[in-house]
Amino acid sequence: MKKGLSRRNLFKYMGVGGATAVVAGCEKKPEKLIPMLVPPTDYEYTPQTAYQYMTTCRECDAACGMMVTTREHRAQKAEGNPNHPVNQGALCARGQASLQTLYNPNRHAHPLADGKQIPWEEGMQQFSAIIQAASGAIAYLGKPASGSEGDFVDEWLQAAGGGQRFKFNLLTQKSQTEANKIAFDHADVPEYAFEKAGVVFNFSTDFLENWGNPVENARRFTDMHVYKNGRKNKFIHISPQVSLTGAKADRWIVINPGTEGLVALAIASVIQKENGTYKFLKKYLQAYSPEKVAEATGVSAEILSELAIDAMEHGPLLALGGGNVSATDQSVETLVAVNILNAVSGALNKTILFSDQTAPESSTHQDLTQLISDLNAGKIKLLIVDDSNPVYALPPSMGFLQAMKKVFVVSLASQKSETTHAANLVLPALTAYESWGDAFPRNGVRSIQQPVMSTVNMFDARAREDILLSVAKSVNKKAFSGNSSYLDYLQNIWQKIQRKVGDRRNFDSFWISVLENGGIFEKPKFIRASLNRRVASVKLNDPGMAGSDGLTLLPTTSLLLGDGSGANKPWLQEVPDPMSQIVWDSWMEINPDTAQKLGINDRAIVEVSTPYGSVQATAYYHFGIHRNAIAIPMGQGHQHSGDVADGFGINVMELLPDQMDKAGSLVFVGAKAKLKLINEKSYTVNTDGNARQLGRDISAATTVEELKHPEKHSAGHNRPVEFYPDRSETAGYYKPYRWGMTIDLDRCNGCSACVVACYAENNLPVVGKVRTAIGREMSWIRLERYIEGYGDDFETRFSPMLCQHCGNAGCETVCPVYATYHNPEGLNAMVYNRCVGTRYCSNNCAYKVRRFNWF
């Protein structure tokens, strides 16, 4: 725990200070408050009234629609925009926590020059001077733009004398678009119609976590996988590791790391032999028959043939590929193989739909290699960086930090990071909650980003685009003529959009409707795609791995922290990882069989070494990992990203090589690691208690066959015998109704968005790692994870646990001061100022959901 003034002592000092103020100010005349009983009709704001603003979430590239509720000119809660066709009112855990970007006390509050605070005028003068001195030798490094921002920056570079824009995103889909170009002549990411599929084959893609749009993927996948009309469609996870996505699978096929493409082609060979489609593939696929790839993949020919039969009998098929776990130097070839499987099985133009739009911007690490080369060669004199954090996110073996130190760096970021820490000049930018923007994430979807509140007064920041526009005008009088702000520039773009969509209203009316709706949403227009013959020339080889021996290192994406940009948000640190239930830390997944052979106990500290670096991590026993592999999640291990992020966990990127695939994307699975036991026990905090149900049937499950016979208990779930008899007045006690809520556990995927939303909605305290270790966490909803079975045939179940509002609640009967009581609607209510802190309620709660605020 960090030292400082405790909350208890703070209130003591406040009490003394308050009494002193009363004595000293006793002669001051009272001020009268005049209540606004009849507010004026032209008043734009009514106190104590909630207002909703539609905007766009910027926590990842998915650009979901967002609805932000404000009161007293302050944003209070973020939800999904129900008008948005992509996320349809839903929001992921990171979107729910995005408010902590806005109110983060570690935001840059003032401009900084070499770490020292300076006035804005001085900062802008320095920026203008270095632009003029650079004479066009400028590089702008920022996130890929899905809206107007990219064109704006390109125009700005021209106005500033020249330069080049480099796009950076650690988690990119460039390999996928390259594979789609090879297979279908469409360098785009298609729309995946999960709901039209009868069976889904997932080749190591974490589509419920960070791949594509997880919110949309979750909705469409659930529509496919949920039990309805007497049947349940199949989901098969084909991967060396079980992630949150894999935990929802009906079956896990364990494969050797990096062999996803071979498995896909083996399945395709059986299907092609059966249906005879795409005859030009016959000879090509014969080389990848189940018998020929069984040894390399670690999957028997019988199982590979079974998968092909599943695809033919339960189709249409949807095969998915991509993501970190399959990101070897053969990523493009692997994704081409998955495309071949989709085409051969008939999924193309059924469950995989291409549009005629230009693909959104994506980044390649090959471009960054060129940037690093130019920085080292002295070809660049000024480097401008936005909120992206390449110093942290890139493998140190690339040498970005060393190259960056050779030029003058200007950071236009809102948050602290390792990159801004190394910058010469920091001009703090506003967050997406306070600035204008837009996003065009897919065909027919144009989302607007508007400021939902004025700038938080403790942060002296400006909109990034307005900073650029202002400095451009100072060095070039002709720059952006007619645009006094980025809003003017944006409205000019949207006037063109208005004409394109054929809206005949005046622009003011059109603009207001855009702001009210959150954008313009048209029905997508799809085109037919076909498989290109060139795929038969794509060869799959064994993926290259640095290190002669050891275990294959699988860097996995974090559901909550993403690429590490969410690490300085306390809610995301305090919410347990759904699979490991670990908080405020990193860990290394290892198969128990492998660990025991190496003499490594669960939760021991292990040194993980590759040819590129070494870290110390906590061993976490996980049945869902290949016996010749380990997995470490990304996102932790920060040093200069804020009080919440710094000092927790490790950065797995320190173990990776500077290696690219054929699309120029970073190779995540390219090294083997050696393990060395350091300590028998680590200080790692997890909240699951016991991962096993121990026969208590807390998270019950059944099969589709049993559901067809409701007379059986497992299908009907007959009411268990109650310990207490029914209350005599129950029948007529609740008038006119009794509150109730149902959670469909078949739909729950463990995404933890509800847990983060509860923190935001109820303003729950965050207690930190130390207090969580002794059971003082304050979350009102927890996501329980239970494991059934052992070995490769294990099963993961998720069960959200919250107050059950019991009809005969144990907490109510033991409270000596009646602080908790039963209201007429059946709710377990609470009078907080009655509570004296006995905590009898917590002891007597059967579900252990009562919380006590130890602060």
Residue ranges of predicted features:
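N-terminal export/assembly segments and adjacent metallocofactor-ligating motifs
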Residues: 1-274, 283, 291, 300-302, ...
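Domain-level signature for respiratory redox metalloenzymes
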Residues: 2, 67, 192-199, 233, ...
